[in-house]
């Protein structure tokens, strides 16, 4: 799948870590933006700050990993965000490690299997275990944020507008997500893929909005990111706390 994945295979899976002072396992800079768009945004936004912010949260999702072995990353001290009925909870991570055949891979990938309806595995969260507060919006792996789409919702009495913009059709340029006019995501190029909203609610216990987003830059790429309000730079709503990237190309 082109030169991007040849590079990824050399660097194993990419786990971008969060805003605490622990040392990260590995870091990957957010892909550079080569073209400016016409979206009116603040001069300082979380996209620019994420390039220099040290990151030390770690996340994984249920997936058949090719580029790393999740068994060497996750352990029983991790927690998970999971869905039970219409409610969402944070609890002790329950998972399994399996070897599953992949017809598109020359090696046997390692599958991280969930025991519940897991959205995200995280090495740490400041929130207490139990039911978490969520925004009044339906979200799942099919809640796509296609260019031109707008999601309006409220959380903790505050109204939010999550808007997606991009240029082009199949090959999108400057794919951008705006939260109340503040740019939180921008990718210079996205090939035949769409972003998606996986979760919106409070994951760090400060009563403010946090997000889990699917942000693939290619239709054969896994890329999920955690955004926390407690990682927000001054005067911004949130910052990227962690990201996981892997590949399922043929």
Regions found by a protein language model. Give the residues of each.
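Acidic/hydrophobic-patterned starts of short beta strands in beta-sheet-rich repeat architectures
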Residues: 162, 205-215
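Beta-propeller blade termini
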Residues: 149-151, 195-203
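Bacterial signal peptide processing site
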Residues: 20-22
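Repeat-based blade/solenoid architectures
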Residues: 145, 187-197, 245-250
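C-terminal motif of bacterial Sec signal peptides marking the signal peptidase cleavage site
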Residues: 16-18
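Sec-dependent N-terminal signal peptides
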Residues: 5-14
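Beta-propeller blade repeat segments, especially FG-GAP/WD-type strand-to-loop junctions
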Residues: 221-241
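Terminal, intrinsically disordered low-complexity segments enriched in charged/polar
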Residues: 26, 30-180
